[in-house]
């Protein structure tokens, strides 16, 4: 037996009904006024259809007939249609006036809701701007840069030229910390703090 998946919401039900009865229901443009008692006809025609229940049909029909598209179509001179698109009488003035009032009320509610949401968004924006301003730290006068005194160095004594001795290498632009790793007469191999090894003259090393 084939497993029929039920429709999930009124939107899907309306789309399905419009597919089954295209001369009666539409998804775009102005909707046609429906025959009075069309729910019963719809329930009977779809009685064996497992995709949709009577409860879903009733809810979907209520949503369809309260939409602006449908209410716009309920106007003087318009004719009601059945499921097959057959004309079932002209609309009564009472129904036309009721549709106009319902449409005006619905539009007024939407407009009021939009106005309320816009005001709420403005209020939230002001509150955020105020909070952001309060969180901003006061600007402090920039502190004068701390001038570090140059490290005073001296020439190495003869007995200080030993492997593992921490020294300063005079690079011309300043001193760099290093460690003696090898001594070969006047040439001394040192390792800088960054791991780089280099050979320098003994006269360039300072304590």
Curated annotation (Swiss-Prot):
Which biological processes are named by the entry's GO terms? Answer: post-transcriptional regulation of gene expression
Q: Which SUPFAM superfamilies does UniProt cross-reference here?
A: FinO-like (SSF48657)
Function as written in the Swiss-Prot or TrEMBL entry: RNA chaperone with significant RNA binding, RNA strand exchange and RNA duplexing activities.
Which Pfam families does this one have? ProQ, ProQ_C
Name the family the entry cites: Belongs to the ProQ family.
Gene assigned in the entry: proQ
Where is it chiefly localized?
cytoplasm
> What protein am I looking at?
RNA chaperone ProQ
């Amino acid at each position: 037996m084939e497993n029929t998946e039920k429709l999930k919401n009124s939107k899907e039900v309306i789309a399905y009904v419009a597919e089954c009865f295209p001369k009666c229901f539409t998804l775009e443009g102005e909707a046609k006024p429906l025959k009075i008692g069309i729910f019963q006809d719809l329930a009977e025609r779809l009685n064996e259809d497992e995709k949709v229940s009577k409860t879903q049909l009733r809810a979907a029909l209520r949503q369809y007939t309260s939409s602006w598209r449908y209410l716009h179509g309920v106007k003087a001179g318009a004719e009601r249609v059945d499921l097959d698109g057959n004309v079932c009488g002209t609309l009564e003035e009472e129904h036309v006036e009721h549709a106009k009032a319902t449409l005006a009320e619905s539009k007024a509610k939407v407009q009021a809701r939009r106005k309320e949401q816009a005001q709420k968004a403005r209020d939230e924006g002001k509150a955020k701007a105020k909070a952001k301003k309060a969180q901003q730290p006061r600007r402090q006068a920039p502190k004068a840069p701390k001038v570090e005194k140059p490290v005073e160095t001296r020439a190495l004594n003869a007995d200080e030229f030993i492997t593992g001795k921490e020294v300063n290498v005079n690079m011309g632009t300043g001193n760099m910390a290093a460690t003696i790793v090898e001594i070969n007469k006047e040439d001394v191999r040192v390792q800088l703090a960054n791991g780089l090894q280099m050979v320098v003259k003994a006269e360039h090393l300072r304590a």
